[in-house]
Curated annotation (Swiss-Prot):
Record bears the keyword Transport: no
Coiled-coil portions: none
Keywords: Peroxisome, Peroxisome biogenesis
Protein name per UniProt: Peroxisomal biogenesis factor 8
GO cellular component, one term: peroxisomal matrix
Function description: Essential for peroxisome biogenesis. May play a role in triggering the protein import competence of individual peroxisomes. It may interact with PEX10.
Organism classification: Eukaryota, Fungi, Dikarya, Ascomycota, Saccharomycotina
Motif residue range(s): Microbody targeting signal: 648-650
Main location (coarse class): other
GO biological process: peroxisome organization
Compartment(s) of residence: Peroxisome matrix
PANTHER family the record matches: MICROBODY (PEROXISOME) BIOGENESIS PROTEIN PEROXIN 8 (EUROFUNG)
Length: 650
């Protein structure tokens, strides 16, 4: 008893005794800020917003000093009607921010774990609260965004400190939380859901797909067999994603939630495709999915010259699409069913290639070097069509070429990209398509491009098509609707005109290296022992004389921007002639060596030395492949060139 107790009157002593029996002697218990927060979470005022609640959580969680408060705060939050209600009427945008909020909380707590509540005890208490909620099947769906947010923090924790105190116990909680996330996602997706909650679950699943094993994903796939279509709808059609292409024309600076997770979503799509147990259903779903993606790809063509922001979004979308396509092609290769591949795969490949056709202006900007997934998808689709369905390939050529606005190619990135993709595809199949398509449709268009194209890449692609067309007669072609003899005659009739035009384009449009490839390629298909030579024995002489006459009339005018020999037009054309000397028949070989030497002697200094070295290399190359002809060339060299005391490579 206090010393002053006896000095009090009767009423004073009664009050003192009453205070002593209270839980808090000599004071009145007042609510703490945390008590107010608990009340605010479970019964928010009209002025309370979801953002305000999340800011409270982000502030208070890392500062909590005992497990009981961690558990209590978690349980109160999961009863907050602004995010969770019994009717499961949620806002996708608001509830998605729960994921980001808890990732931030876990990151922050991990970094300030001491000296208050250690991270393991904090984490375990939070998990304990989630486990209590999961026990009620009607409330299990509420746990998903919290669990996913915590799991997203795992990688950043490892980057910060891979072996913190109690790291093995922390890893145990991680594993239990992964199982909980998989289990709650499976239960949450089973049955009818509001669109927002379904979207939330799909994004949440994509965020943790790298931590789930195939068996867990397969269980989710079984309760939600339409999840691949949901993923596609969410990505390409919903306002949370690309919104049917409208996102690209919006001025909103905030990147939509789904677009931020496109990489994860495409990985999830690939994983689910690879383990889908019902092949027929999968094939039907993929057909519809590719329809949606192709339709979206057509919407981007309305942007002829994208801004930097649009380019950035388009790159992300391209990578995501290619990843999905790679998963589709890999799945059918995994099945390895010839009947299925021959009936289903060509249709899928047609839609994939058309999407790539529409997106080629993006590929043209970033390039495909090192882009192995793109190269795999393109090569796989091409192989499928050439193996199973050439008519579809022909249809694609007609549709694509007809859709190109040729007059806009020079001023529109999209039209230029379409034309370049079309030409690349034509180059790959020109030896397989029907003669009618080839001679009546393809070749006239390509010849016109070679003569009139202003864009350098288009010009070079057109030349590549023509070279492939010419070399296609070098071997017998078994394709249907292809008359081999007719092809040989067409090549013979067009070759000299094409070579003349190519030589005219040097050096303004084509480099010496490019013209050299053209000259050497055409020479190989016209000289003796070729199908073209059998059809027209004199054609090789026309080609040879055409190149030789260019050497005769070429001036010593220096080529622009050339640092190494040959630096003159005469030297350049002479080097072209030297490239095809090994192909000349034996009985004409020495006479052409003499003509070439005469041309070389018309040059001086380094240019002459370069041409003589090149001529000697040509003779040595001839000797390796045609020893009899090479022996004649070597003898001639020592008798004529060495006697003139010219520098030569010996």
């Amino acid at each position: 008893m206090q010393p002053w107790y006896h000095k009090l009157g009767r009423q004073g002593r009664q009050l003192a005794e009453q205070w002593q029996t209270d839980a808090e002697p000599w004071g009145v218990a007042t609510p703490t800020p945390l008590d107010y927060l608990f009340d605010e979470l479970t019964a928010p005022k009209p002025s309370t917003t979801p953002d305000k609640v999340l800011s409270y959580l982000a502030y208070y969680y890392p500062k909590l000093k005992n497990e009981n408060n961690v558990e209590l705060l978690t349980l109160c939050f999961l009863r907050c009607p602004l995010f969770f209600n019994d009717a499961q009427l949620v806002s996708f945008s608001d509830n998605y921010r729960v994921i980001e909020c808890f990732k931030y909380i876990m990151d922050k707590k991990f970094q300030i774990s001491q000296p208050t509540l250690p991270f393991y005890r904090f984490y375990n208490a939070l998990f304990g609260a989630l486990a209590k909620v999961v026990a009620d099947s009607a409330c299990a769906w509420k746990v998903v965004p919290v669990a996913v947010g915590c799991l997203l923090s795992v990688d950043s924790r490892n980057d910060y400190d891979r072996y913190p105190e109690h790291f093995q116990l922390i890893a145990t909680v991680d594993a239990k939380l992964v199982d909980m996330a998989a289990h709650t996602l499976e239960r949450s997706m089973d049955g009818p859901l509001s669109n927002d909650l379904l979207c939330l679950n799909v994004v949440a699943l994509s965020c943790v797909q790298d931590k789930l094993v195939d068996s867990q994903l397969l269980r989710i796939l079984r309760v939600r067999s339409d999840i691949l279509k949901i993923l596609t709808e969410l990505t390409f059609n919903s306002p949370y994603g690309l919104d049917n292409g409208r996102l690209l024309t919006k001025s909103n600076a905030n990147t939509p939630i789904v677009v931020r997770h496109l990489n994860r979503i495409s990985f999830l799509f690939t994983k689910l495709t690879s383990i889908h147990p019902k092949i027929v259903l999968l094939a039907d779903d993929l057909d519809l999915i590719l329809n949606r993606i192709q339709t979206f790809s057509e919407s981007v063509l309305s942007i002829p010259n994208p801004s930097e922001t649009q380019w950035s979004t388009l790159r992300v979308v391209l990578f995501a699409q290619v990843m999905m396509f790679e998963g589709i092609m890999a799945r059918f290769f995994q099945i390895n069913n010839h009947s299925l591949n021959s009936t289903v795969l060509p249709t899928l490949c047609r839609k994939i290639l058309t999407t790539l056709f529409n997106f080629n202006f993006v590929v043209d900007r970033i390039g495909t070097g090192g882009f192995e997934s793109y190269n795999f998808v393109y090569a796989s689709c091409l192989s499928t069509l050439t193996s199973y369905d050439i008519p579809t390939a022909e249809t694609l050529i007609k549709c694509w070429t007809s859709s190109v606005a040729f007059k806009k190619v020079d001023n529109s990135a999209t039209e230029r990209g379409k034309l370049l993709f079309d030409l690349q595809f034509i180059e790959n199949v020109v030896n397989l398509v029907s003669d009618s398509l080839k001679f009546e449709f393809i070749i006239p268009i390509v010849q016109d491009l070679i003569g009139n194209a202003q864009d350098q890449a288009v010009l070079e692609s057109a030349h590549s098509v023509m070279l492939k067309y010419f070399t296609s007669v070098d071997t017998y072609n078994e394709a249907q609707l292809v008359d081999y003899t007719n092809n040989v005659k067409h090549v013979g009739a067009q070759l000299i005109d094409y070579l003349t035009l190519s030589l005219d384009q040097f050096p303004a449009r084509l480099s010496l290296s490019q013209v050299g490839i053209i000259v050497e390629t055409l020479a190989k298909i016209t000289f003796p022992d070729t199908a073209v030579h059998e059809c027209d024995p004199e054609l090789y002489r026309e080609l040879l004389l055409l190149v030789y006459n260019r050497c005769l009339v070429a001036t010593s005018e220096e080529l622009p921007n050339v640092q190494a020999p040959p630096k003159t037009r005469h030297g350049a054309f002479t080097s072209l002639l030297i490239r095809i000397l090994p192909l000349i028949p034996f009985d004409e070989y020495q006479s052409w060596l003499e003509r070439t030497l005469s041309l070389a002697f018309r040059t001086v200094g380094d240019e002459r030395t370069y041409l003589l070295d090149l001529l000697w290399d040509s003779i040595l190359g001839t000797n390796r492949h045609y020893p009899q002809k090479g022996y004649v060339g070597i003898q001639w060299w020592y008798e004529h060139v060495n006697e003139s005391q010219e520098k030569a490579k010996l």
